[in-house]
C-alpha cells in the first residue's frame, strides 16, 4: 500500500475540505481518466483496490497512472479506551481529494475498455466520480 517513506511530523490535524482541487485537474499522461465530483478522503487501501481492479480488467494491455498519493496520517485510539490521554497513534494514510481532481489515467486501450475498467475502480471509492477524455490544452 502507498504511504510516505518519512514525514516531518507523525500526526496531523484534520484540515479543511473547502474549495476545488488546486492541481491535477487535467489529464496529463493518458487518454482517459477518472475525475472526482465530491470532496473527501481516499485511503491507501482504496487506491490499491482501484489499481488492482483496473489492472485485472485491462490484463496486460494499456498503461495506468495513479495521480493521487496518501500523504496524510489518520490517528485512531484503541477500542474501549476512555476519552482524553492525548491523541491516538497513526492508524492509516489518506489522500485529501477535492472536486475536479484526476485520480487515475489510462492509455493504449479502447474507450469502452477504459470506461469499464474505471467504472469498476469507481465502485471501490466512497466518493462520486466521472469518466473524462483528454482534451488538448493550448
From Swiss-Prot:
Q: Does the keyword Ribonucleoprotein apply?
A: yes
For biological process, the GO terms are: translation
Keyword hit for Flavoprotein: no
Keywords (A to Z) from UniProt: Ribonucleoprotein, Ribosomal protein, RNA-binding, rRNA-binding, tRNA-binding
Q: Which GO terms describe its cellular component?
A: cytosolic large ribosomal subunit
Show the InterPro entries listed in the entry: Ribosomal_uL16 (IPR047873), Ribosomal_uL16_bact-type (IPR000114), Ribosomal_uL16_CS (IPR020798), Ribosomal_uL16_dom (IPR016180), Ribosomal_uL16_sf (IPR036920)
Q: Name one Pfam family in it.
A: Ribosomal_L16
Q: What GO molecular function annotations does the UniProt record carry, in alphabetical order?
A: rRNA binding; structural constituent of ribosome; tRNA binding
Q: Which family does it belong to?
A: Belongs to the universal ribosomal protein uL16 family.
What is known about its subunit structure?
Part of the 50S ribosomal subunit.
Job description of the protein: Binds 23S rRNA and is also seen to make contacts with the A and possibly P site tRNAs.
Q: PANTHER family from the entry?
A: 50S/60S RIBOSOMAL PROTEIN L16, LARGE RIBOSOMAL SUBUNIT PROTEIN UL16M
The molecule here is called Large ribosomal subunit protein uL16
Organism, scientific name: Chlamydia felis (strain Fe/C-56) (Chlamydophila felis)
Gene that specifies this protein: rplP
